[in-house]
Structures are given as C-alpha cells and as structure tokens.
Amino acid sequence: MASDEQETQADHEHGGYDRYKELKLLDETKQGVKGLADAGLSKLPRIFIQDNLNTCSSHANNANIPVIDLGSLHHEQGNSSSSRNEIIEKVKDACEKWGFFQVVNHDIPQRVLDEMLDGVRRFHEQDFEVKKQFYSRDVSKRVFYNTNFHLYTTSEINWRDTLYCRLAPGPLDPHQLPSICRDITVEYSDHVKKLGLTLLELLSEALGLERSYLNKDIGCAEGVLILGHYYPPCPEPELTLGTNSHTDIGFVTILLQDQVGGLSILP
C-alpha cells in the first residue's frame, strides 16, 4: 500500500513539474516560508499557488461579529442572575448564528496580549541556526515549529509558518519552550486557561446544562494548545492564502489577532 507521501509524489510528477520534490526541498531547509521571504523572491513558488482561490466578498467583510462584554463577571454584580443570564443569552445567540464572537473586558492585561504577539514574532524572526533546532514533523513532540502541518498530504499549502506548543494534558517542562518567548508563553497560557474555563461555563449554561458540565463532566478543558502563526511578506499575495477555509478541531479556539487583521468568518 502506498503512503500518503508516495501518492502525492505520483500525482504531481508530470509536465516537468515534480511537486513532491519541491515540497521536500522546502522541508529539508528547515527555514520554512520565512526562509523563502528572506531570500527576496519576486515570484511565488509554484507549490504555493492556489488555482481556485476562495476569498470572502466585500459584503462579508462588512458584517459585524458579535461582541460580548465579560466585565460584569469579574465584579460582585456578576453574581446576579440577571447579569449572568444576559451574557449567557448573548453567547447562545452568537454560537447559533455565527459560531464565533469577540470578547471584551476578559481580564487579560493588554501587556500580556501584546507581549505574546511579540514573543511569537521574535521566535520566527530569530537567527535560523537557533530556530532550526525546533523544526520537526514529529507530532508527538510537545513543542516544535514547521511550515504547514500537512505539507505532503494536502493539495493546497499556505504561506505560513507555525510554532506549536502543547501545554496540556500533562505538565509541560517550561524549558522545552523556546527561551526567546518562554516566559510570556507561560504567563499568557495561565490567563487563557482561566478565560477558557469561563467560556466553557457560559457555553454549558447556554446549552441548558450545569455550569461545570463541559469542563468537569466531559473534560473539554483537558487539552491546551497554543499555535503561533507567522505570515511573512508574500511576493504575490493575490495567488495564495496564509490560511485556507477550515474548521478548527478543538472544542473552543481563543484567537489573538494582531493589528494586520485578515480574519474571515463564514457564518
């Protein structure tokens, strides 16, 4: 039986273009997409070109994502049933209609958010000789980075590198994290875990369940994964995407986006 990599290789060895070979060359450099950008390319490599590029319409870009204020949950009045029930109803409505919402007054300091974004940026932009020790396709590792997790098995690859940090289940030795962003990753994860538990409680109640159901009864908070995506400047951005249309595999994704933007939501 042929492996996924062998099948991909056979599918693309035609017309003088060996797609598998080009993917392999990219992978073996351990420099990711950042390495291509640093080389000063004027043309997008063929392996990144997406023939059926699907982007959102301008109408979709003008839609208003639901915004939910969690501020009252962190104060004494948050214990009142009317205040909490109002938030629960907003969460329920947002999930039914969008599957996505923005939270404000979530109690995570802006300093932590800014430093986490900067930490991810520092990791990807540090000296290659230091960074390459983390490059891997071994998904059993708790911490690694690469370009496109499914590089050899997908028909469309993205202009993106990713730092992967699996903090739970099981304790992670902080020394496994890159030193250049270690402290802020630990601090950020502590804050995000607390926010995640709050959201699971609200989602449980929005479903008409006990507040602790999603967390304690069925263990939706057992796994914690941080993905630090990095999108280098692209020579021909109209021909590819940083992230294709997809559905996340986790129960809840907490997204931290920088000032560049570009996120599209399909309701």
Located regions from the model:
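Peripheral, non-catalytic segments flanking oxidoreductase cores
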Residues: M1-P267
